[in-house]
Amino acid sequence: MLKKTTKNIVVFASGSGSNAIKIYEYFQKDNRVNIKALCCNKKSAPVIQKFQNIGIKTIVFEKNNLDNGGVLKTLLNLNPSLIILAGFLLKMPAEIINSFKNRIINIHPALLPSYGGKGMYGINIHRGVVENNELFSC
């Protein structure tokens, strides 16, 4: 019989947290998954209060902590099995991506850095790619 192991997840979000909350609600049905923390770069983002209200650790940081290794150090201490970027609006530094290779999912479908920002999802990304004669769009 296979032993069940709990997978710890860290969620990154920057705004209202609608996607982050849906992820939380989904994993409430699965005791093999634990959302260990929410990381947010905006101290006024509504997602912070939502996660505090349900008892999940919230970590608020400034952009310079993302760039200078402070967030990486926190993530290494949390040691998540998976990092989910759920409406997180900053570009992840290469150091974090390399430290958590194949353990980061970005559910916001932007093609960064070329096609990021407000409104850049769905057909808007594809239009941008086509208009700029680029070769890749998914």
Description of each model-found segment:
Residues M1-C138:
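One-carbon transfer enzymes
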